[in-house]
């Protein structure tokens, strides 16, 4: 049996996830963005805000690579400004959805070559776009863990609770 999950489903899920995070962060305040990423990190991202900027800048840069554009420098996007981060995220998402909408069907499975850090990689746009979305999902899960470990109660972010692919969640009344 084949079950199809499209890139559009993953985009819809990550759009929902971003809205959920933005709403939660606005309620908590920008201090959450300064929470440290932990002592065992690799040193690239020192705070929740820096990890969020990385989510959005990675998306933008993968679109840049697939579009043959110069790589976006995201260093000027402040990592301590909720609205600024999500505005950058809206811009990167607009570019990704435009790429998905306009990339010809015949090009989705044709490998492209580009530089990634200190390597030259050769991958299909399909793989790069799926990776970009899974990369985001993975990092939001890391952020959820970090904020929980720092005493914040978060929202449910599981795909199951999202509106994507339908379904319904009804909470039962607690019985005393």
Predicted regions and their residues:
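Carboxylate-rich helix-loop segments that flank metal/cofactor sites and access channels
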Residues: 105-118
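Helix-adjacent hinge/juxtasegments
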Residues: 68-108
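Short, contiguous alpha-helical
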Residues: 8-27, 32-75, 117-176
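Short, contiguous pre-domain boundary segments
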Residues: 2-3
């Amino acid at each position: 049996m084949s079950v199809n999950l499209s890139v559009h489903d993953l985009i819809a899920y990550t759009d929902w996830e971003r809205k959920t995070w933005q709403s939660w962060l606005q309620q908590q305040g920008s201090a959450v963005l300064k929470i440290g990423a932990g002592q065992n990190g690799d040193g690239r991202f020192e705070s929740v805000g820096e990890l969020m900027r990385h989510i959005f800048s990675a998306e933008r840069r993968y679109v840049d690579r697939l579009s043959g554009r110069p790589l976006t420098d995201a260093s000027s996007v402040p990592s301590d400004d909720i609205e600024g981060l999500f505005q950058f995220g809206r811009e990167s998402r607009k570019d990704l959805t435009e790429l998905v909408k306009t990339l010809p069907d015949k090009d989705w499975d044709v490998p492209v070559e580009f530089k990634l850090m200190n390597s030259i990689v050769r991958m299909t746009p399909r793989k790069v776009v799926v990776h970009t979305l899974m990369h985001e999902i993975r990092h939001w899960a890391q952020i959820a863990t970090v904020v929980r470990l720092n005493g914040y109660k978060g929202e449910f972010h599981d795909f199951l609770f999202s509106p994507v692919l339908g379904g319904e969640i009804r909470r039962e009344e607690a019985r005393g």
